[in-house]
A protein has these predicted regions:
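A glycine-rich phosphate-binding loop feature that marks nucleotide/adenosyl-phosphate handling sites
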Residues: 44-45, 63-65, 79-87, 199, ...
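Function-dense linear segments that define catalytic or interfacial modules
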Residues: 157, 164, 171-189, 193, ...
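Polar, glycine-rich mid-to-C-terminal structural blocks
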Residues: 318, 327, 331-409, 417
Length: 761
């Protein structure tokens, strides 16, 4: 290697290249790692050096060289590359490797307008010194390379135009904790700050993108998911559209319920005009969703919901596919089809489904969610009433069209609205659940807006986070983590701003949280269980029982201290009804694990003191934040031992946790013979989870005789999910062979919808 090359320093001076210095940094970064070769990294990077190269470019080149060596056989290169990247990142942020004192850092950032000045108003210099003593900067060294790149790209406070970075990860964690607990009493708050900081910086609790990137800055909107219901009037349609624009501009993912909109040809003003139908209004919503791009990267994302029995359903089911013309397609949203038991019964009995315009059948639309017996009574009555406009379709044909579109686009989702209301934390008579959100894990009550400042409407918000099952040794640890997650997210509801009165009203009244899990696949592998063979059923029951029990207990304790949420009386919890009372009893045939916690004592305590939060749990996808914790995505099986995610910094490779020891214990997605085992586990989780679950179905056409997935199989899985009480189905993934090219490298699914961290964590 040519020792006479000149390099340009960060301050503009030039000097001879110092290869020893580079070697020392590499040695430091490789310490304690297995199966990594410093000389290999040096060889790969030296050939890219040139005369006059900047020291920062040398650093980037070495990092890239190490990252390119990450593989199944040498997973530790992900830590070598990460340490080099942290070194580089701190040099960029602080001008040196050692971070500054926390107090001086905060003062400087507040002056620059990067941090919210409430930090300096709420905490004294002395308290900042105490917080500084809580920080363990060495935890930066536990990140994988993919995590550091995600931090740089999405989470650290920066100038997105110049690329300047202003902080390191441990400052992010301690300041999120400081902001969330800033209104707690002086004598206890630093204790909570320390405990919360420790939980998030050791990856035991995973936070969603809006919280990681936004809390501590002057922008205060951190809800991941927003649910907006539209009425059947022009005022309501316009109010919905305005609400969408307001929330899309603030990084949220949107769920739209447009099921009330009357069908094509319905009379308007007593027949003076006839209605243009749903599609023009769906296009209007699509334009609103795509109006604000996040940092110029891409527009927002939404899932729009409608009932299966809507008169226009056959035109609505095909809106996403790539046939048809611009006029009859609305491709840039995803869709959720709402179904109930009566529809499934008609399918099983070979009957018809009758389609109506909601405007022609008084009471039917509301009963669809609030009262299944009343829905059936009205539905049959309207079927037999010749004066009402309707269309009959064979149930099997309608279901087949829906499943065919789900298979070809992957993005037609399912909501079983009866399960969402019969196994729900809300009393369907006063607070029915009429829609879900972008990623199908939220189930909250909404009311249509009549104008954007309508105080009587209700826009539902959900604030998310997750427990990292890979970072805990026993389920007992969940008790402390539940206390921290519930308290932090509950405090966030008071800390954030609300662009729309109807959103603030609902958030303050219901105080809904959605706490889920990441790293479930690692938890199964670690415990020697598999998705597909039933071996994980009892463990899953035990795990999710613990999660829901500890979350309810934490919210109940918080209610004793700060009062129950104002609309607690609209929940089933207020009547002493718990998830263990209303689950689908078909699950008892596939799991025989007893209950392990004292639910009866908890029931009494909830009846007496209430809950601070109407909902506590939801199982969301976690593509991005699971990379920070080096965890597997949500409850999903991994697609490969090494996943690849394309980012603006090139390819990020991530190896499944503890690969060397557990490679034979992981069950990969396409090794699962069918969806049965997975759907059973989702049903068992849903027994305890009070909202819903982003559950996917997966098909490998090569497993079937004709190389095609038979319709019968698709319908069977849909019915299996319903049988086990599954509330919602999210993506349908079809294996196309492309991802098998490199044996263990699996592309991570690119879901434009949730990239911003909207509705997922």
């Amino acid at each position: 290697m040519n020792q006479s090359l000149l390099v340009t320093k960060r301050d503009g001076r030039t000097e001879r290249i110092n290869l020893d210095k580079i070697h020392r940094v590499l040695d430091w970064a490789a310490e304690g790692l297995n199966n990594v070769s410093v000389s290999q990294v040096e060889l790969r990077s030296h050939i890219q050096f040139y005369d006059g190269i900047k020291t920062s470019d040398i650093h980037e080149t070495i990092i890239k060289a190490a990252a390119d060596l990450i593989s199944r056989d040498a997973p530790d290169y992900q830590y070598l590359a990460a340490r080099l990247a942290i070194f580089h990142l701190r040099k960029k942020a602080f001008g040196q490797f050692e971070p500054p004192a926390l107090y001086h850092h905060v003062v400087k950032m507040v002056e620059l307008g990067k941090y919210d000045n409430h930090l300096l108003e709420d905490y004294t210099e002395e308290e900042f010194k105490q917080m500084d003593s809580f920080i363990v900067h060495d935890r930066d060294m536990t990140f994988s390379y993919a995590a550091v790149k995600q931090l740089e790209g999405k989470y650290l406070v920066q100038n997105r135009v110049t690329g300047e970075i202003y902080e390191s990860a441990q400052f992010l964690y301690i300041l999120v904790a400081a902001c969330l607990f800033s209104n707690y009493p002086r004598e206890t708050r630093l204790d909570y700050v320390k405990r919360f900081y420790d939980a998030v910086s050791t990856f035991k609790i995973s936070l969603p993108t809006p919280i990681m990137s936004g809390v501590r800055t002057p922008t205060r909107q951190f809800s991941s998911c927003v649910l907006i219901e539209c009425g059947d009037s022009l005022d309501s349609i316009n109010a919905t559209s305005s609400a969408i624009v307001k929330y899309v501009s603030q990084r949220a993912g949107i769920g739209i319920n447009a099921g009330r909109i009357r069908a094509l040809g319905s009379p308007i003003r007593g027949g003076e005009a006839f209605h243009t139908g749903c599609i023009p209004f769906y296009k209007h919503f699509q334009t609103a969703v795509k109006s604000c791009s996040q940092g110029g990267v891409r527009g927002g994302a939404a899932t729009l919901f409608y009932p299966m029995w809507h008169l226009e359903v056959e035109s609505l089911l095909v809106l996403k596919n790539n046939r048809g013309v611009e006029g009859n397609r609305v491709r840039h949203m995803d869709y959720g089809v709402q179904i109930n038991k009566l529809m499934y019964t008609r399918l099983l009995k070979g009957g018809d489904i009758t389609l109506f315009s909601p405007s022609d059948v008084p009471g039917l639309y509301d009963a669809f969610f609030a009262d299944q017996d009343e829905f059936e009574r009205l539905y049959v009555k309207y079927e037999n009433d010749d004066s009402i406009r309707k269309q009959r379709v064979k149930a099997v044909e309608l279901f087949s069209l829906m499943m065919q579109e789900r298979a070809s686009t992957g993005r037609i989702y399912i909501q079983n609205v009866d399960h969402c209301n019969t196994h729900s934390p809300f009393d369907p008579v006063v607070a029915p659940v009429r829609q879900s959100n972008l990623c199908l894990e939220i189930a909250l009550p909404t009311k249509p807006l009549h104008d954007v400042n309508d105080e009587n409407g209700e826009v539902a918000l959900c604030t998310l986070s997750a427990f990292n099952l890979g970072a805990i040794k026993t389920l007992d640890e969940l008790e402390e983590l539940a206390i921290l997650a519930v308290r932090a997210l509950d405090a966030l509801l008071d800390y954030q701003d609300y662009p729309i009165p109807a959103a603030k009203r609902g958030a303050m009244g219901r105080r809904t949280l959605g706490i889920g899990v990441i790293n479930f696949a690692y938890w199964l592998a670690k415990n020697g269980k598999r998705y597909s063979d039933g071996s994980a059923n009892n463990l899953t029951h035990k795990t999710f029982e613990a999660i829901q029990y500890y979350l309810l207990k934490a919210s109940n304790e918080l209610a004793k201290e700060q009062g129950a949420c104002p609309w607690f009386n609209e929940t089933t919890y207020a009547k002493g009804i718990l998830p263990i009372d209303t689950y689908k009893k078909d699950l008892d045939a596939i799991v025989n694990e007893p209950l392990h916690y004292d639910w009866e004592q908890l029931r009494e305590s909830i009846k007496t003191h209430g809950l601070r939060n109407s909902t506590l749990s939801a199982l969301m996808p976690s593509e991005t934040s699971s990379q920070i914790s080096n965890a597997t995505n949500g409850i999903e099986p991994p697609r490969g031992y090494v996943s690849i995610k394309a980012s603006k910094d090139g390819i990020l490779r991530q190896v499944v946790p503890d690969y060397e020891h557990l490679k034979d214990a992981y069950e990969l997605l396409w090794e699962m013979p069918n969806n049965d085992g997975y759907l059973q586990l989702v049903g068992i989780m849903q027994k305890f989870i009070d909202q819903s679950i982003s559950a996917n179905t997966n098909y490998d056409p090569s497993r079937f005789p004709s190389g095609k997935v038979p319709m019968q199989q698709l319908l069977k899985d849909l019915l299996t999910a319903y049988k086990f009480g599954v509330k919602t189905l999210y993506y349908q993934n079809t294996r196309d062979g492309a991802e098998d090219a490199q044996d263990d490298l699996a592309p991570s699914i690119q879901d434009d919808g949730c990239e911003s961290g909207a509705c997922k964590i």
